[in-house]
């Protein structure tokens, strides 16, 4: 199964598409005391093997940890397939040097990296086109989101549902939480306004958790970043 949440010594493991479980079926698990993972911790996103499954209480025991493909350090999440570097074009204003630092950090993961530009309803179509051209010349797919154009979001959501495990990375206040609330109905993470003084947002997400958005896809809900993860 897939570890979708971690808290204290417990792990929430989803058995969707594993064995007899076609739909999402989550179990609260602890690691078997006799198991030694060679000092290797278990993270959200890890694939694990569970036994002693109790269908009534939804409890089980983790007996082994499968080899992971990658591990993001901050926040700690494993087996990412896609990273979407997310920045707003206004409020706060786009900072190209900061975008570059996030891109460099993401590239070190060895996964597919794309750019998402939010709040594009605050700029002209001309500037939007110039930004797309600039970043695509850098070699990155660039997705623009506009509150007045639902088709932009719907096209992006369709793309996300084709990916295995996607994460949004970027500074606070750029709209990651709002975007996650749109992608995952019922999530309802709180949002916070951008500070007029420091021109940055406040982190509104506290715990790392995976949410299923299709039979094959998950989205990582993570704490925001105030600065570049380098």
Question: Which ranges hold each PLM region?
Answer:
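Loop/turn-to-beta-strand initiation segments
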Residues: 82, 112, 164, 215-218
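Switch I (effector-binding) loop of TRAFAC-class P-loop GTPase G-domains
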Residues: 69, 186-217
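Conserved nucleotide-binding/hydrolysis micro-motifs of P-loop NTPases
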Residues: 54-56, 89-92, 120-123, 148-151, ...
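Conserved beta-strand/loop subsegment of P-loop NTPase cores
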Residues: 80-87, 109-118, 139-145
